[in-house]
């Protein structure tokens, strides 16, 4: 399976990602606070993040050619974000600079690597439909487009439509979760990526009381997903792997088990890898299987982009698999 990494590099696969770039203000604690509670934490760490920037970085670090689209503010955080994207190998030449602060998140990570995240859009909220139109030639110079919902909905929808009409495969990450997606966005998106809880909310499916997602009727989930408008979807199950719906086929992707230090950004590493796999011509199920390795590697480090591995590092960590 790790041989797919060679294909990603050799194919010179091209990816456009539009969306969020944030500075993550991260603190560790023994446990996450309950509502109204204060707990002691460790030192505050500033790390590069943002769902879209994370996805772009993960794809670039394993060898894909990635263009990032979006906006940073006019503050010290802007240079910090751009520097880290460039270090990962991401093309930042189309990123705009707007007045005001860059995007930020406040993250708390507990001793088990679980986290809570609060997001402040900042410059990400200023990415407009006009910007999409001005960047259209560069946006469509790719094989796939990655989207999340940390940018204005009208901007995301316009970009999806532009790229879909140009023949790109469009992968939509419904996160931060929106239950009622615009019909035009659904129509213009080829693949949906959500976690198990987002899937349950989206399709109004009861979550299993024992958290046994393997006991779910995935054939029924696939039928409902098709009815919703997606013939292809990936449902991530955290540390339990993922499920891929590809037309009439359902694939259960096993997890890659590691001792997690911090799960921040693991879902984004997963999506970035799926983007890279699709851009290099691989099936959705194979791309998701490779993504299990890349996201597992990310869980063994601290932070989002800071924990992402190169193709060589991932091969070394997991061996010939």
Q: Where in the sequence are the language-model features?
A:
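Conserved beta-alpha-beta core of the PfkB/ribokinase-like small-molecule kinase fold
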Residues: 144-220, 240-242
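Short gly/ser/thr-rich secondary-structure transition/capping motifs
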Residues: 88-89, 125-130, 170-177
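Conserved phosphate-binding/catalytic region of the ribokinase-like
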Residues: 2-15, 179, 210-321
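Conserved phosphate-binding/catalytic loop of the ribokinase/pfkB sugar-kinase fold
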Residues: 71, 97, 107-144, 149
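Glycine-rich phosphate/adenosyl-contacting loop at the front of the ribokinase-like
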Residues: 1-71, 76-80, 87, 260-261
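A glycine-rich helix N-cap at a beta->alpha junction
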Residues: 84-99
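A short, aliphatic-rich alpha-helical micro-motif
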Residues: 139-140, 185-186, 227
């Amino acid at each position: 399976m790790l041989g797919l990494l060679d294909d990603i590099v050799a194919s010179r696969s091209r990816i456009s990602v539009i969306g969020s770039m944030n500075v993550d203000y991260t603190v560790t604690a023994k446990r996450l606070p309950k509502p109204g509670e204060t707990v002691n934490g460790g030192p505050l760490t500033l790390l590069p993040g943002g769902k879209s920037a994370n996805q772009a970085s993960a794809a670039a670090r394993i060898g894909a050619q990635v263009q990032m689209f979006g906006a940073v503010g006019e503050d010290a955080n802007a240079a910090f974000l751009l520097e880290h994207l460039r270090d990962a190998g991401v093309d930042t030449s189309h990123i705009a600079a707007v007045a005001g602060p860059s995007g930020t998140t406040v993250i708390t990570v507990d001793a088990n690597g679980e986290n809570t995240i609060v997001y402040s859009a900042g410059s990400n909220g200023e990415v407009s439909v006009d910007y999409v139109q001005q960047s259209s030639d560069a946006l469509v110079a790719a094989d796939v487009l990655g989207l999340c919902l940390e940018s204005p909905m009208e901007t995301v929808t316009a970009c999806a439509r532009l790229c879909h009409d140009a023949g790109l495969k469009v992968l939509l990450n419904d996160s931060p979760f929106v239950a009622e997606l615009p019909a035009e966005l659904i129509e213009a998106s080829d693949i949906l990526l959500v976690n198990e809880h987002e899937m349950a909310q989206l399709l109004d499916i009861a979550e299993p009381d024992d958290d046994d997602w393997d006991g779910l009727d995935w054939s029924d989930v696939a039928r409902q997903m098709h009815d919703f408008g997606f013939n292809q979807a990936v449902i991530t199950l955290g540390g339990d792997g993922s499920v891929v719906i590809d037309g009439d086929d359902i694939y259960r992707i096993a997890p890659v088990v590691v001792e997690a230090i911090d799960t921040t950004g693991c879902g984004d590493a997963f999506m970035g890898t799926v983007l890279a796999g699709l851009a290099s011509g691989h099936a959705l199920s194979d791309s998701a299987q490779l993504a299990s390795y890349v996201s597992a590697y990310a869980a063994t480090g601290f932070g989002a982009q800071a924990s992402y591995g190169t193709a060589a590092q991932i091969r070394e960590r997991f061996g010939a698999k």
